[in-house]
């Protein structure tokens, strides 16, 4: 089907849905039609803008052929033609991007997990830096950042930390952060001034609701035990810590941050649900498009995606060859938008090649 025919078909569908909604339908039929109509609004607006520019270009070209036009009028028409011809490719690209298959998870909130990797205590300190960076970014975006669990080293580092980030389209912005983040810097304890390299792993999961993932009680094994602090000593006398295992998948979540067993269980279930949902998403994505495995956003957690070089003051994203020489703004202030927007644009460009 030609591109123009496809656009006409979408406009017809949108008009038919509008007529259907105006006809007084009710119940499930109304809900379904309303949802479809709302989903088409954005792409229809872009199609109409594209068609309008095409129509205006055709009119301008026809007008230019008329006999007896003075030079001033002819120059004005040629300027208009030039402007329209330059705008059409951009408008067409906007339509194609709007037509790309949507990731159902993009509109969801997210759970972010940061774990210290290779590099000992320096890796744990870097994990804490990353976790705080995402907290700053969430604040800049007006999202709600709720710490779920932190396992600290006692001297400022995090063995692992997780948080729930709530807001509109959070997952669509943060999903490209999944992977291995590497840091190069001189540790405070390094007397010779040598640069050390360490790493931390980031996992970003769409926060799943109960309607997304139904977890049966019979599929869960719940163990309770006493919470322990640094060095392994017990920090309370009740079995407040919780370990939940999802038997069908083998996915396990353990939490002991809260003094209440009930609160630990609720948080653990939230993380568990997100991990199961993400696992199902990954399987479906692989089945649907094996050809996209190596592309940005594959979510490969073993892939080294970004390096933070403190002596040089730079942050480099290896997937899109983007380097910014403003490490403090990125790390301390959470100014991640340049990376986020570039990664989204790159992902869209690669998807467009598949159309």
From Swiss-Prot:
Location of the region described as Disordered in the Swiss-Prot/TrEMBL record: 280-306
Organism: Rickettsia africae (strain ESF-5)
Recorded GO MF terms: translation release factor activity, codon specific
HAMAP family found in the cross-reference section: Rel_fac_1
Biological role stated in the UniProt entry: Peptide chain release factor 1 directs the termination of translation in response to the peptide chain termination codons UAG and UAA.
NCBIfam families: prfA (TIGR00019), PRK00591.1 (NF001859)
UniProt keyword list: Cytoplasm, Methylation, Protein biosynthesis
Protein name (database record): Peptide chain release factor 1
Primary gene name: prfA
Residues recorded with modification N5-methylglutamine: 233
Record has NADP as a keyword: no
Maturation and modification: Methylated by PrmC. Methylation increases the termination efficiency of RF1.
Family in the record: Belongs to the prokaryotic/mitochondrial release factor family.
């Amino acid at each position: 089907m030609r591109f123009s025919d496809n656009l006409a078909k979408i406009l017809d569908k949108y008009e038919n849905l509008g007529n259907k909604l105006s006809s007084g339908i009710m119940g499930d039929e109304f809900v379904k039609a309303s949802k479809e109509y709302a989903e088409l609004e954005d792409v229809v607006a872009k199609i109409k803008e594209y068609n309008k520019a095409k129509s205006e270009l055709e009119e301008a070209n026809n007008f230019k052929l008329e006999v007896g036009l003075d030079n001033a009028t002819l120059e004005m028409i040629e300027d208009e033609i030039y402007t329209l011809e330059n705008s059409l490719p951009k408008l067409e690209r906007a339509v194609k991007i709007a037509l790309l298959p949507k990731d159902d998870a993009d509109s969801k909130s997210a759970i972010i997990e940061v774990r210290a990797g290779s590099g000992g205590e320096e890796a744990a300190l870097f994990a804490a830096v990353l976790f705080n960076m995402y907290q700053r970014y969430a604040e800049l975006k007006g999202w709600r950042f709720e710490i779920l669990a932190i396992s600290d080293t006692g001297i400022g580092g995090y063995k692992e930390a997780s948080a729930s980030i709530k807001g509109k389209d959070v997952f669509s912005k943060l999903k490209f952060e999944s992977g291995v983040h590497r840091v190069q810097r001189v540790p405070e304890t390094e007397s010779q001034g040598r640069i050390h390299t360490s790493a931390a792993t980031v996992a970003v999961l769409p926060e799943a609701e109960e309607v997304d993932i139904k977890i049966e009680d019979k599929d869960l094994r719940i163990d309770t035990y006493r919470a322990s602090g640094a060095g392994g000593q017990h920090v309370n006398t009740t079995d407040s810590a919780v370990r939940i295992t999802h038997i069908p998948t083998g996915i396990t979540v353990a939490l002991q941050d809260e003094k209440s067993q009930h609160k630990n269980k609720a948080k653990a279930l939230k993380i568990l649900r997100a991990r199961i949902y993400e696992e199902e998403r990954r399987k479906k994505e692989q089945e649907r498009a094996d050809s996209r495995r190596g592309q940005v956003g594959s979510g490969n957690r073993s892939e080294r995606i970004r390096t933070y070089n403190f002596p040089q003051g730079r942050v480099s994203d290896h997937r899109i060859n983007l380097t910014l020489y403003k490490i403090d703004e990125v790390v301390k202030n959470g100014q991640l938008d340049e990376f986020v927007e570039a990664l989204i644009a790159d992902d869209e460009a690669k998807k467009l090649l598949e159309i």
